[in-house]
Amino acid sequence: GHCIRCQPCLAVCPRGAVSIMGAAASDCTPLAGNIPEPRQLDTLFKGRRSVRHYKRENVSPGLLQELLDSAAYAPTGSNAQNLLVSVVDDIAAMDALREAVYLRLDELAETGAMPDCQRRAFFLSAGKLWKAGGWDGIFRSAPHCVIVANAKNATCVEQDPLIYLSYFELMAQARGIGTLWCGLLYWCLRDVLPDFLPRLGIPDTHQLGYAMLFGYPSINYRRTVETRSALVRHIGWN
C-alpha cells in the first residue's frame, strides 16, 4: 500500500519514537487523562440545540480559530483532506452578504427569473419580506457563517463537509457558541445564486457541501430535551 498521511504510526507507538511529516510525539496531546467523561460527552450531544437568536457581536478571532483548528481533525474519505472552508467572520461582511442575497432574490422574483428549485416559494417571498420589514428568514440575524465545499474528485465529496460541520458545531456549542445548520442558505447558493460561490472563495473545482450559521446566542438553554430514538434494527446473518 501507500501512505495516505493519516499518522496512526505516530499515534500508536508506545515509546513515542516515530516522527512523520514533520510531526513528533512531543507535538501531540497524550490521550491518557485527556478524554472527556462519557457522561459529559453525552450531555453535550443531548444539549446541542439549534440557535436562531444571536447577539450582534463578533466571535473573538482567537476563539474562532480554536473552533476551526478542532474541526480540522474531522475525518475525510481516504484521508483526502481536500475541504475548502469559507468563513464570514465579521458582522459587516455578513450584513453585506445578507443584503446582496435578498436584493438578488427580490430581483429574480420581480422579473420572473426565479429558477425552479427546492424551496422556490420561500425564495420568491424572502427578498420582498426583507425589503418590507427586515425579516431575515435565511440568516436569522446571525453574525457569522461557515460554508464548506469539497473537491469534486474527492472520495466522499458529499459526506466530508457534513462530518466537518458536525465537529465544528459540537466544539462551538461546548464553548458557548450557538450554531444552526442552514439548509436555506445551502439551497439558495446551490440552486439560485451559484454565481455567489466564487466570491465566497469556492472555485469550480469544488462542490458546495453545506452551510452553518454561528455566533454568541442571545438566549441560553437550561437543560436537555427528550427525543425519539432512531429506528434501530439489530441484524443477524445466518
What are these regions (language model features)?
Residues 1-238:
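Acidic, surface-exposed loops and disordered segments
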